[in-house]
């Protein structure tokens, strides 16, 4: 499916809705991205889910922070239909196959997001593993400590 790519004001992107599944931002990566941006390097668009009112950031927290740090006012974004919950679900698998590698703590947090949710925790270990980009064994270990 093809989604609209649009330049969004950074101030229009919601980053405070629990859609960041990393434990913390990597300050070195943010700095590196900011330096590259000032040199004209073009980054892929961030991914946001738009519910008609808010643009919920699902993937691209380091790029958004780097953009803010260098004083940019906008960023290219891929706009997908959906709400905060959709963005949160998407975010658990963000960077599983590309971008800044996730730490083991990041992976555990992604799985925990699903296991702590009333609906999502009913899903099979396989489904959660596939969505989070981790092994089924990892999900099982977190589900049954």
Predicted regions and their residues:
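Short, charged/polar connector segments at secondary-structure boundaries
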Residues: 1-80, 91
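Generic secondary-structure transition motif, activating predominantly at the C-termini of alpha-helices
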Residues: 17, 37-41, 96-97, 115, ...
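Generic alpha-helical segment signature
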Residues: 26, 85, 104-107
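Exposed alpha-helical structural elements
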Residues: 29-32, 87, 91, 110, ...
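Short secondary-structure capping/turn micro-motifs that flank functional sites
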Residues: 52, 83-84, 145
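Residue-level "edge-of-site" marker
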Residues: 80-81, 142
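Basic, amphipathic alpha-helix used for nucleic-acid engagement in HTH/winged-helix/SANT-Myb modules
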Residues: 82-101
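Alpha-helical interaction elements
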Residues: 97-145
């Amino acid at each position: 499916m093809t989604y609209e790519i649009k330049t969004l004001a950074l101030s229009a992107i919601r980053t405070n809705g629990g859609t960041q599944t990393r434990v913390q931002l990597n300050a070195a990566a943010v700095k590196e991205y900011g330096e590259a941006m000032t040199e004209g390097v073009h980054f892929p668009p961030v991914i946001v889910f738009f519910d008609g009112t808010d643009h919920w950031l699902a993937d691209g927290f380091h790029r958004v922070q780097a953009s803010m740090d260098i004083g940019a006012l906008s960023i290219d974004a891929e706009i997908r239909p959906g709400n905060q919950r959709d963005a949160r679900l998407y975010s658990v698998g963000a960077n599983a196959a590309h971008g800044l590698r996730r730490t083991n703590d990041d992976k555990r947090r992604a799985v925990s997001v699903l296991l702590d949710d009333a609906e999502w925790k009913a899903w099979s270990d396989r489904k959660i593993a596939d969505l989070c980009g981790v092994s089924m064994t990892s999900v099982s270990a977190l589900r049954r400590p």
